[in-house]
Swiss-Prot record:
This protein's record includes keyword Cell membrane: yes
One cellular-component annotation, GO: plasma membrane
Membrane-protein topology: Multi-pass membrane protein
Keyword Cell membrane: yes
Protein keywords: Cell membrane, G-protein coupled receptor, Glycoprotein, Membrane, Olfaction, Receptor, Sensory transduction, Transducer, Transmembrane, Transmembrane helix
Glycosylated residues in this chain: 5
CDD domains from the UniProt entry: 7tmA_OR52E-like
Gene: OR52E6
Record topology, Cytoplasmic segments: 49-56, 123-141, 219-238, 296-313
Entry's localization field: Cell membrane
Protein name: Olfactory receptor 52E6
Alphabetized InterPro entries for the sequence: GPCR_Rhodpsn, GPCR_Rhodpsn_7TM, Olfact_rcpt, OR51/52/56-like
Length: 313
């Protein structure tokens, strides 16, 4: 028997409940999220502007950082305004198309960030382990190629999710205990098998774990090269050049790890803890990345002070 209309097959809208169990304090939870959103916007925009306008920062490492800033600006803007709408104005309803759109952009920018972090790890590996080859390997053409690969792989991993969800019937199920839209959050509501969705999701996670493995291997090689240097002063200087990148990786991976860990093994943990950790996963990296690079990278710090505060260094 044919489906009567698309609305019966795909419910017209969903309800994002926010953080279940903490509804009474939603309005107060919104303030720290608003604060970190402002920090993410101002910090990433400032660093992106500085890299774009300062000729001395037109180097591979800073091009990668500019890509990271663009991704962080996009990721935070794709998630936090909707969260604030739920927390402050009780705007919980989102259309089916709106859900798919937000889900697409959240996963797309998350995958892109993972790839850019791999590129930044490769940049540090070449700079420390193969310094004489640095300018020959990491040319502007190679950086453009990395950016293209990041976009194409993200599309390859995320576009199928949209079509995997479009094929599912939801039978009127529309309540989602979350603050933003993600693939399995809606797939679980389907009144049909989601085995294909789960298998594709596991494949995507495997690719992201491969990114993590590449980052770890590059840093093992970096540490080996650093501790082969003749003096402690040279070792500390080399380690300092990697400090910002390691901080960014920890900001990206730590909330994701705890969110994944609690979902897999924390069955007795209250649901609001799961949702809160998932929120940190999309909020913390865009907020901390500009702070980490602004504080730890002397060249960026001095350039920001000179441009925005008219100080001489």
């Amino acid at each position: 028997m044919p489906i009567a209309n698309d609305t019966q097959f795909h419910t017209s809208s969903f309800l994002l409940l926010g953080i279940p169990g903490l509804e009474d304090v939603h309005i107060w939870i919104g303030f720290p999220f608003f604060s970190v959103y402002l920090i993410a916007l101002l910090g990433n925009a400032a660093i992106f502007f500085v890299i774009q306008t300062e000729q001395s920062l037109h180097e591979p490492m800073y091009y990668c950082l500019a890509m990271l800033d663009s991704i962080d600006l996009s990721l935070s803007t794709a998630t936090i305004p909707k969260m604030l709408g739920i927390f402050w104005f009780n705007i919980k309803e989102i259309s089916f198309g709106g859900y798919l759109s937000q889900m697409f952009f959240i996963h797309f920018f998350t995958v892109m960030e993972s790839i850019v972090l791999v590129a930044m790890a490769f940049d540090r590996y070449i700079a420390i382990c193969k310094p004489l080859w640095y300018t020959m390997i990491l040319t502007s053409k190679i950086i453009s190629l990395i950016a293209g690969i990041a976009v194409l792989r993200s599309l390859y991993m995320v576009i199928p999710l949209v079509f995997l969800l479009l094929r599912l019937p939801f039978c009127g199920h529309r309540i989602i205990p979350h603050t933003y839209c993600e693939h399995m959050g809606i797939a679980r509501l389907a009144c049909a098998s989601i085995k294909v969705n789960i298998m594709f999701g596991l494949g995507s996670i495997s690719l992201l774990l491969l990114d993590v493995l590449l980052i770890i291997l590059s840093h093992i090689r970096i540490l080996y090269a650093v501790f082969c240097l003749p003096s402690w002063e040279a070792r500390l200087k080399a380690l300092n050049t990697c400090g910002s990148h390691i901080g960014v990786i920890l900001a990206f991976s730590t909330p994701a790890f705890f969110s994944f860990f609690t979902h897999c093994f924390g069955h007795d943990i209250p649901q609001y803890i799961h949702i809160f950790l998932a929120n940190l996963y999309v909020v913390v990296p865009p907020t901390l990345n500009p702070v980490i690079y602004g504080v730890r990278t002397k060249h960026i710090r001095e350039t920001v002070l000179r441009i925005f505060f008219k100080t001489d260094h």
